């Protein structure tokens, strides 16, 4: 198994974004089923408590979910009164999200096919920007962070949950990754190839994220490397061995 190597952002393969889009298009159906099961499990309440402790208090706030996938955060937060907008690069994922949220008291959530690096919203439009397991897929995560800063209101909150999944693929026994137990071997290998195409795979995170967010102009930037201990303490069908972190920042 080849080792990860540092790739300058400007030297990434031209087709990396298309490869990421293709991968998630193929996974959209099974991924949606997995999120349906997660939304009907104890994990929904676990994530609801996790997010509400770190988001602005009270309902009615506009929240942008970047890389929304099948709409799990919308299913968790829309019933709490948050005005949810989900964006994803993959049309198939957006289709799955609309269907799933229509059945989970989250029909008011809005969904758009949109690039995380180019969110087409006015400056200062959202009270919060949230994301889960997205930034590891981005060819230009610093540009994405800059755009998320732009669309946030002054005092708005950024919450990003992610992990060093590329390093974890080489570090952990993949039999421990129960969340991917039903993912086809060909897609696992496709994901592995994407890891090696992305500069972000070799970065030291969340240290890199904290540095970039401070440089952009966020304040109160904090990295919590214990998020995975809270959110993935049970080895069930949602378990991933990778050490999830949470980066929180305020505009």
Provide a role label for each language-model segment:
Residues 128-141:
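A short SAM/SAH-binding and catalytic strip from SAM-dependent methyltransferases
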Residues 156-163:
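Conserved beta-strand signature within the Rossmann-like core of class I S-adenosyl-L-methionine
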Residues 216-219, 233-251:
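Core SAM-dependent methyltransferase catalytic element
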Residues 2-58, 72-76, 104, 227:
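Conserved class I S-adenosyl-L-methionine
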Residues 117-128:
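A short acidic, Gly/Pro-enriched loop at the edge of an enzyme's catalytic core
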Residues 64-66, 70-118:
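Class I SAM-dependent methyltransferase SAM/SAH-binding core
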Residues 142-154:
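A short glycine-rich, Lys/Arg-flanked "PGG" loop and its adjoining helix->strand segment in the class I
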Residues 15-19, 163-233:
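C-terminal alpha-helical "lid/dimerization" subdomain adjacent to the S-adenosyl-L-methionine
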